Amino acid sequence: MADYKIHLLSEDEGIDVTFDCSEDTYILDAAEEAGIELPYSCRAGACSTCAGKVTEGSVDQSDQSFLDDEQLLKGYVLTCIAYPESDCTILTHVEQELY
C-alpha cells in the first residue's frame, strides 16, 4: 500500500503543512490524524464545506456527488472523500470559489 505526501496550503488561514496519507485513507481523515483542522460538514461528498483545489498531483474522488464536471476539471476536490493517487499539493478553504 502506497503512502503519499499531502501538502496543504491556505494563505488566509496560515496553513502550510505536509503530512503522510495512505492511498486508502481520505485526505480529511489523514489531516485530522496529523492534528490539522480543516472545515467539513457532511463527510459524505454531498456538500462543499471541505472543498480544496489540487494544484499538483492527483486524487480519486469517485465517491463525491456535489462537484460538477467543470469544477472537477479545474482541480476542485472534496477532501472528505478524496484518496490520494500521488503526492499532492492542495489549496484549502476554497469553498467560496465554487460559487
UniProtKB/Swiss-Prot annotation:
It is found in: Plastid, Chloroplast. GO terms for biological process: electron transport chain. InterPro entries: 2Fe-2S_ferredoxin-like_sf, 2Fe-2S_ferredoxin-type, 2Fe2S_fd_BS, Beta-grasp_dom_sf, Fd_pln. Pfam families: Fer2 (PF00111). Its cofactor is [2Fe-2S] cluster. PROSITE patterns: 2FE2S_FER_1, 2FE2S_FER_2. Residues 4-96 form the 2Fe-2S ferredoxin-type domain. One of its GO terms (cellular component) is chloroplast. Keywords: 2Fe-2S, Chloroplast, Electron transport, Iron, Iron-sulfur, Metal-binding, Plastid, Transport. Binds 1 [2Fe-2S] cluster. One of its GO terms (molecular function) is metal ion binding. Belongs to the 2Fe2S plant-type ferredoxin family. Ferredoxins are iron-sulfur proteins that transfer electrons in a wide variety of metabolic reactions. Forms a complex with heterodimeric ferredoxin-thioredoxin reductase (FTR) and thioredoxin. This is Ferredoxin. It comes from Porphyra purpurea (Red seaweed).
